[in-house]
Amino acid sequence: MTAAASDPHNPRSSADDTASPRCESGQGSFFGRRKGHKLRPHQNGLIEHLLPRLSLDPGASGPSDPATLFGRPVKEMRIEIGFGGGEHLVAEALAFPRTGFIGCEPYVNGMAKILSQIEAHDIGNIRLLAGDASELLAWLPRASLARIDLIHPDPWPKRRHWKRRFVQDATVAEMARVLRPGGEFRFVSDIADYCAWTLSHLARSPGFLWLAERATDWHNPWPDYTMTRYGRKAEREGRRAAYLRFRRESDAAQA
């Protein structure tokens, strides 16, 4: 835990935060569905016509069988919170066509980018939520997910904004509820303080076990990891990311 916190990571500037879309909802509040660059006409068309067909509504009754969300059989289901430009989520969906994916992203530009990729590759195993990730977790049934990914989230570096970080005791408890035993929460960040924060919150949850035995386990991406645009930028600027994996322990193992 302390090793992750001691790496010399450089905090992102506020300009980088704006350029790097993220979905944050620490205590059930939704911090900003925003729009950056002006959308092209085709992107506007995708937002208007394709997004409604793929969007989920946590205000509706929760699905007893989440596989029904995809209109075809899926072996398991994963979610990615704050997918940004969608590079990682699209790569995962193409690599695992029998897995259902839900992506949460509040930024309209991020939605437009991933919709373009979904259309171009005819991807049928992605569903989307342009809203609060904590509402999505609360909406899903117990033990319904195989994995949750949180990749380069907004670190909210100012102390008064820490409550806006996605990783909070309440969201960790919700992740433990919706992940099946053996499922994983995966976290990537180049911000040392947020890595230490995440390790601290997960360490005090009996539902999770940090899957690291040596420093190389969290210094390097897991096999087949797709680097995001922000991740490549961080590497170019000399900022090392931590790649943290936490396994959902069974209730029997916790006893």
UniProtKB/Swiss-Prot annotation:
Listed SUPFAM superfamilies: S-adenosyl-L-methionine-dependent methyltransferases
Gene3D superfamilies the record matches: Vaccinia Virus protein VP39
Keyword ATP-binding applies: no
UniProt-annotated binding residues for substrate: K158, D190
Keyword check for tRNA processing: yes
Covalent S-S links between cysteines: none
Ranges where the record places region Disordered: 1-37
A GO cellular component entry from the record: tRNA methyltransferase complex
Keywords: Methyltransferase, S-adenosyl-L-methionine, Transferase, tRNA processing
Residues bound to S-adenosyl-L-methionine: E80, E105, D132, D154
Its job: Catalyzes the formation of N(7)-methylguanine at position 46 (m7G46) in tRNA.
Designated name of the protein: tRNA (guanine-N(7)-)-methyltransferase
